[in-house]
Amino acid sequence: MGIKLINIGFGNIVSANRLVAIVSPESAPIKRIIQEARDRGMLIDATYGRRTRAVIITDSDHVILSAVQPETVAHRLSTKEEVVDEVDE
């Protein structure tokens, strides 16, 4: 099992092995998680000033803001896993 990298928009890449959740930023609990991460210094803003469309939570409690849709990030993750599985066979 190697390192899998996922593009989260604008050339920003995160390790797929570290992802815990990819969620929409619209709900109050997620907004609270974003604010708490900002206060702790654990927020990474990868939106380049654009609207936040996906919030990525990692196993190290970092919260990453992305300007691409959660479905797009999830699709990139599943596509990457399929390609790796085909190479392993």
UniProtKB/Swiss-Prot annotation:
| UniProt-listed InterPro entries | RemA-like
Q: Name one Pfam family in it.
A: RemA-like
Highest taxon above the source species: Bacteria
Q: Which family does it belong to?
A: Belongs to the RemA family.
What NCBIfam families does this protein map onto? MtxBflmRegRemA (NF046064), PRK04323.1 (NF003315)
Name of protein: Putative regulatory protein CLH_1161
Organism equals Clostridium botulinum (strain Alaska E43 / Type E3)
